[in-house]
């Protein structure tokens, strides 16, 4: 789809990757960007094309209300996400897993269900879901987060089939570490939000159904055809070093 002149909505738009999406869409010539956040007062902007919008993605009724208010949207970017950094056997694993699923999986579904009719009414448009390389490879320290992202990836693939008939481009974005507050304690190499957003917007305009936004993600995706014994030795070694 063409970004110039489009009307877009970005969830989790008040900081990090979401804020970078808003800026890049404006730079690409978007006519309007709904910057959705739990508290729209946290959206910092002086551009009249930006419309702060209250949206807690875990609230299905609020997602439906947002869809009614933003009825001119042709591009929806589901970016809102959280990570509790819990391993499956941690004391707080169930609490962390439920919270992550509420935002990363059920929240994504709430937004997709609310806006699919809006996209259909506006010519099909595009629905973009932010996933992670952890949709495919799983470290204990982020095991519950990875489960939520794997679930979201599965939902995206199903939605792509469901929405193809109405002309909606459904894009799954996979990326490793991005330099945001969520990864503040991570010492591994990170992509900048601007690098990731540029790759995604290029993919949208090219009609892509999947965007692999960094080299780590491309490497892991290529290795998925291998036996697990080939994919996981590095994960095991890293875990063993931590617990030693």
Tell where the protein language model's regions lie, with residue ranges.
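Active-site helix of classical SDR
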Residues: 112, 148
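Rossmann-fold cofactor-recognition segment
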Residues: 47-61
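Conserved glycine-rich Rossmann-like NAD(P)H-binding loop of the short-chain dehydrogenase/reductase
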Residues: 26-44
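Conserved mid-core segment of classical short-chain dehydrogenase/reductases
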Residues: 83-98, 141-144
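C-terminal helical subdomain
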Residues: 172, 180, 184-222
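Conserved glycine-rich cofactor-binding loop
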Residues: 7, 14-15
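Residue(s) in the substrate-gating loop at a strand-loop-helix junction
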Residues: 132
């Amino acid at each position: 789809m063409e970004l110039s002149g489009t009307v877009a909505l970005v969830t989790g738009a008040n900081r990090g990757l979401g804020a970078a999406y808003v800026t890049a869409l404006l730079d690409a010539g978007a006519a309007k960007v709904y910057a959705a956040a739990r508290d729209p007062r946290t959206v910092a902007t002086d551009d009249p094309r930006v419309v702060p919008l209250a949206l807690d993605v875990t609230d299905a009724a609020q997602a439906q209300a947002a869809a009614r208010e933003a009825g001119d949207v042709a591009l929806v970017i589901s970016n809102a996400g959280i990570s509790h950094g819990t391993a499956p056997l941690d004391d707080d694993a169930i609490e962390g897993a439920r919270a992550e699923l509420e935002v990363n999986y059920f929240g994504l579904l709430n937004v997709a269900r609310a806006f699919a009719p809006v996209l259909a009414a506006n010519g099909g448009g595009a629905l973009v879901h932010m996933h992670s390389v952890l949709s495919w490879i799983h470290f204990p320290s982020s095991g519950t987060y990875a489960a939520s992202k794997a679930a979201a990836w599965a939902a995206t693939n199903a939605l792509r089939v469901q929405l193809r008939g109405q002309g909606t481009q459904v894009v799954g974005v996979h990326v490793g570490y991005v330099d945001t507050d969520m990864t503040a304690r991570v010492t591994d190499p990170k992509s900048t939000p601007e690098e990731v957003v540029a790759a995604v917007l290029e993919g949208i305009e090219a009609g892509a159904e999947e965007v692999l936004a960094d080299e780590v993600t491309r490497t892991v995706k290529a290795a998925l055809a291998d036996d697990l014994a080939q994919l996981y030795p590095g994960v095991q070694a890293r875990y063993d070093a931590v617990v030693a």
